[in-house]
């Protein structure tokens, strides 16, 4: 359990370090960003399909946004401040297709993160995932919007 906590702390540190770099300055205005890292190759996970859903009043999930991670393993521009309203969201990463493209047979069909957004006022969210063929770990960085 202690090693998992240390791992998550290190992963959060990587996110903060990349946010502080020069490349993160313009992207800090993005209200929802996804970062995916490949733990096997020690590199960004490129071309991972990402789908975002929003929970409706009747409990079903409606498509909200989608895209693929870039060379950096990041996906920006999923939504705008105006559209990213209070609610419950689900981020789904197509991990099976990612590993299959690398010739690896994975255990999981996909990785998902379900979270409540903006219930304490408007915030920006970075969802980070560390993938391996038989496991995944996620963390989030929630911050105030940058002007």
From Swiss-Prot:
Listed transmembrane segments:
none
Q: Name one GO cellular component term.
A: extracellular space
Q: Which GO biological process annotations does it have?
A: negative regulation of glomerular filtration; phototransduction, visible light; purine nucleobase metabolic process; retinoid metabolic process; thyroid hormone metabolic process
As stated in the Swiss-Prot or TrEMBL entry, residues carrying the post-translational modification Sulfocysteine are 30
> Cross-referenced SUPFAM superfamilies, in alphabetical order?
Transthyretin (synonym: prealbumin) (SSF49472)
Give residues where Phosphoserine occurs. 72
List keywords of the entry alphabetically: Gamma-carboxyglutamic acid, Glycoprotein, Hormone, Phosphoprotein, Secreted, Signal, Sulfation, Thyroid hormone, Transport
Principal location:
secreted
| Changes after translation | Sulfonation of the reactive cysteine Cys-30 enhances the stability of the native conformation of TTR, avoiding misassembly of the protein leading to amyloid formation.
Record-listed L-thyroxine binding positions? 35, 74, 137
Q: Which family does it belong to?
A: Belongs to the transthyretin family.
Q: What does this protein do?
A: Thyroid hormone-binding protein. Probably transports thyroxine from the bloodstream to the brain.
Please describe the quaternary structure of this protein: Homotetramer. Dimer of dimers. In the homotetramer, subunits assemble around a central channel that can accommodate two ligand molecules. Interacts with RBP4.
Instruction: Provide the protein name.
Output: Transthyretin
Origin organism is Rattus norvegicus
